[in-house]
Swiss-Prot record:
Name of the protein in its database record: Uncharacterized protein AF_1733
Species whose genome carries this gene: Archaeoglobus fulgidus (strain ATCC 49558 / DSM 4304 / JCM 9628 / NBRC 100126 / VC-16)
Database matches in InterPro entries: CooT (IPR019300)
Length: 45
């Protein structure tokens, strides 16, 4: 994916949209959000 511009968390679903409008969905639990390093760490599937 290109730069992610939107993230929606619904229970164990994490939905992401990038700057080009592409969409991706993954399952897991958010463990850590590093806004300085631009990382989200998930645990699970």
């Amino acid at each position: 994916m290109e730069d992610v511009v939107r993230i929606v968390v619904e229970g164990e679903k994490v939905k992401m949209w990038d700057i080009l409008g592409d969409y991706r969905e993954v399952r897991g639990r958010v463990v850590e959000m590093d806004l300085v390093g631009h990382k989200i760490i998930l645990e699970g599937e």
